[in-house]
Amino acid sequence: MKELDVVDGIQSAGGWIVRNQDLLLGYAVNLVAAVVILIIGSLIARGISTTLIRLLKARGLDVTVVHFLAAMVRYAILAFTIIAALGRLGVQTTSVIAVLGAAGLAVGLALQGSLSNFAAGVLLVLFRPFRAGEVVDLGGVTGTVREVQIFSTTLATADNKVIVVPNGKIIAGNIINFSREPKRRIDIIVGVAYDADIDVVKRVLGDVVAADTRILHDDGVTIRLNEMAASSLNFVVRVWGNNADYWAIYFDLMENFKRALDANNIGIPFPQMDVHLYQAVKARAE
């Protein structure tokens, strides 16, 4: 009895297949086509991702940023590939895209700040206002760029503090790059007493500048009276030097200016206050 039931089931299934062979053949063709689309799409996504990584590394971009951008491109291609495969199987892709769009909008509103940092990170990668190893001022935060990531940038300060700055804040503010140009101007203000001779002061300061071989004299040297302040004559000294020598030149000039002014008996004023005491005498009436 059981054997007859099995035979009847097989015959019934065979009959159904014969009656619906055209429909099944169409589904089989669509299924094979969808699989082929997925395979080809995956190969294309992998090839483009690999090529993009090679090109971005050749431009010297940060490895983390390179792999992140390559992954984003790969996933975007895979998403379009999956939608195309579903469309081949007869799925209404319009509704799928609508659902994904609504979900993307909801996620975008929830992660508005993070997406802003992401967009800013992409702009920093594309326009390269600074690179790893350069000294920059990012909205009042000064340090050496350690790493440029897709959501934030890491700086190391001179006293070895690590500061993480959101990329959105960087794009919204001013970016000052101290390392991009090979040369940099050093500005120093020197205050002397009012009784000092202007020409003598300029000569003394000029001799100190001329003795420093690190200064790029061909780029120009400026030594002028800049301000007649409340208690001093302020001279401005402007010289040019290589970027790597900036602070060494600055500190050495400051020390040598003090020695030279002392050697020539030129006073350096400092803030002072005169206090006058008056003794009140109370008159006595006789």
From Swiss-Prot:
Q: Which UniProt keywords apply?
A: Cell inner membrane, Cell membrane, Ion channel, Ion transport, Membrane, Transmembrane, Transmembrane helix, Transport
Quick check: keyword Zinc in the entry? no
Give the record's membrane topology.
Multi-pass membrane protein
Spans through the membrane: 31-52, 68-88, 91-111
What's the family? Belongs to the MscS (TC 1.A.23) family.
InterPro entries xref list: LSM_dom_sf, MS_channel_1st, MS_channel_C, MSC_TM_helix, MscS_archaea/bacteria_type, MscS_beta-dom_sf, MscS_channel_2nd, MscS_channel_C_sf
**Where does it reside?**
Cell inner membrane
Q: What does this protein do?
A: Mechanosensitive channel that participates in the regulation of osmotic pressure changes within the cell, opening in response to stretch forces in the membrane lipid bilayer, without the need for other proteins. Contributes to normal resistance to hypoosmotic shock. Forms an ion channel of 1.0 nanosiemens conductance with a slight preference for anions. The channel is sensitive to voltage; as the membrane is depolarized, less tension is required to open the channel and vice versa. The channel is characterized by short bursts of activity that last for a few seconds.
Q: Quick check: keyword Ion transport in the entry?
A: yes
Which domain of life, per UniProt?
Bacteria
Q: Where is it found, in Gene Ontology cellular component terms?
A: plasma membrane
Subunit structure as annotated in this protein's UniProt entry = Homoheptamer.
Query: Which PROSITE patterns does the record associate with it?
Result: UPF0003 (PS01246)
Q: Name one Pfam family in it.
A: MS_channel_1st_1
- In Swiss-Prot or TrEMBL terms, this protein is called Small-conductance mechanosensitive channel
Protein's organism:
Edwardsiella ictaluri (strain 93-146)
**Which stretches are Cytoplasmic in the membrane topology?**
53-67, 112-286
Q: Which GO terms describe its molecular function?
A: mechanosensitive monoatomic ion channel activity
Periplasmic compartment residues: 1-30, 89-90
Main location as per UniProt: membrane
